[in-house]
Amino acid sequence: MALDKSKALDTAVSQIERQFGKGSIMRMGDRASQKVASISTGSLALDLALGVGGVPRGRIVEIFGPESSGKTTLALHIIAEAQRAGGLAAFIDAEHALDPTYAEAIGVDLENLYFSQPDSGEQALEIADTLVRSGALDAVVIDSVAALVPRAEIEGEMGDSHVGLQARLMSQALRKLSGSLSRSGTTAIFINQLREKIGVMFGSPETTPGGRALKFYASVRMDIRRIGALKAGNETVGNQTRVKIVKNKVAPPFKEVTFDIMYGEGISREGSLLDVGIEQGVIQKSGAWFAYGEERIGQGRENARKFLKEHPEIRDRITREVYERLGLGGEEREELEGRAEPVL
């Protein structure tokens, strides 16, 4: 009986491969690699919380939060990390609000960044789909879902009702995109805003625009919030930011991390390293002082962060020791640094 089942299945597999091509169906054990390849986010703490060393390749990722919370900054860091690993990226600026000077300060290679400011939601998503199907991109960012205005709404009169148009547009686009992303190994990052539902008595009134499709299709959803200001004396130099991973299909969800976003600089690698280093016992904190072994690296968090920025050899030594404490070998370390090959 078992032999008959095996023969019947082999016949079915052969028929599927003749019709749809070799590799259209296979046993999971036959795949060369089952590890989820990733692109670093620029924050060591967030990479670890995501469980695979960053945002997964070949998947849809949603970053949402209030205004000025760091959504675009996080997306630009992912682009910078993809480029640093030798990859290509695109930024579709539906809001028409990208600051190239800030993007360059974060580390984005503007010379090799593909950039578009589309006229409508349909145009933006068609451009994204064409780029993804080329198979050449590592990451594409759409900023933002709320700004993907359907053509009918643009051409209509102010005040006209267009109920459900954007939700239908997103649903159709994501159905097309999801398969192309998986085949190409491209990560699609959708930035989204927050809206409030009227008349909600219990639970959170907050929701994201664009319908339910993005919530279903996204493998990772990150809620990013500004939770405090970073000061140097009386001057505010950055924001303390919290990210909650509200959905994760590739690792356990609901993890929360905090990191620093410095004005004009982006996510502070050194600040993130301090947090993870203390957590892993590599860096010692006594009162206001931070120390690495016998060496004091600063009094106060900002001074310790500056010390690590000015002494890259000590920063790299601490990073290596943190990886060792976490039990990460060379291959996993490459993934955390955003240099893993995409799984096609």
Swiss-Prot record:
GO molecular-function terms, A-Z: ATP binding; ATP hydrolysis activity; ATP-dependent DNA damage sensor activity; damaged DNA binding; single-stranded DNA binding
Task: Give the originating organism.
Answer: Rubrobacter xylanophilus (strain DSM 9941 / JCM 11954 / NBRC 16129 / PRD-1)
State if DNA damage is listed as a keyword.
yes
Q: What is the recorded name of this protein?
A: Protein RecA
Name of the coding gene: recA
One GO BP annotation here?
SOS response
Q: Where in the cell is it found?
A: Cytoplasm
Q: Which SUPFAM superfamilies does its entry note?
A: P-loop containing nucleoside triphosphate hydrolases, RecA protein, C-terminal domain
User: Major location, coarse class?
Assistant: cytoplasm
Q: Which residues bind ATP?
A: G65, P66, E67, S68, S69, G70, K71, T72
Q: Which GO terms describe its cellular component?
A: cytosol
Keyword Transport assigned to the entry: answer is no
Protein keywords = ATP-binding, Cytoplasm, DNA damage, DNA recombination, DNA repair, DNA-binding, Nucleotide-binding, SOS response
Q: What does this protein do?
A: Can catalyze the hydrolysis of ATP in the presence of single-stranded DNA, the ATP-dependent uptake of single-stranded DNA by duplex DNA, and the ATP-dependent hybridization of homologous single-stranded DNAs. It interacts with LexA causing its activation and leading to its autocatalytic cleavage.
